[in-house]
Amino acid sequence: MSENKDVRGRIVVGVDGSDHSALALRWAVHQAERTGADVEAVACWQWPASAGGFLPYENFDMSGITRKTVDAAVASVVGDGEQTGVAVRTTVVEGYPAKVLLDAAQGAELLVVGSRGHHALSGLLLGSVGLHCATHAPCPVLIVREPVQHAPAR
């Protein structure tokens, strides 16, 4: 069995503009630096159920708004990529976040998600998207939590 050493791995990371997803993106980029993998930052959007089928106003560009969010998150972590040497590709898709991430993770080495996104209850240890991905992903999943803040020793 021959092995092609030129094939780079791919790390998929969910990005939604939350602090947890920023931590996940930082972790994915750091891991890619160590392994030589590429990073695919995936963001998605949905029309809110409360919209009732009506658009907020004509030419409302949810995809464009989401693209700006993911691009800003990537820029804050890797800038233009020169300082890290990691190629980060961004993907924006309409759909349910867990399904979008699972589809993107096909063929990936790793799926990285934050422990909670924008819509999770603050008391939960793991959001519904992270839980769904952890139990259904076609590859290993890493769920990134924010660092624990310990009280100073007395």
At which residue positions do the language-model features occur?
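Short, hinge-like loop/turn segments at secondary-structure boundaries
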Residues: 56-60, 108-109
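Small/aliphatic-rich secondary-structure junction motif
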Residues: 2-55
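Structural beta-alpha unit
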Residues: 1-7, 20, 78-111, 148-154
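Short glycine/serine/threonine/alanine-rich loop segments
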Residues: 35-38, 86, 139
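Short secondary-structure boundary segments
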Residues: 43, 115-116, 145-146
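General small-molecule cofactor/ligand-binding pocket signal
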Residues: 40-42, 89-93, 142
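Glycine-rich, Arg-bearing micro-motifs that act as flexible, cationic patches
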Residues: 110-135, 150-154
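A short acidic, glycine-rich active-site loop
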Residues: 58-69
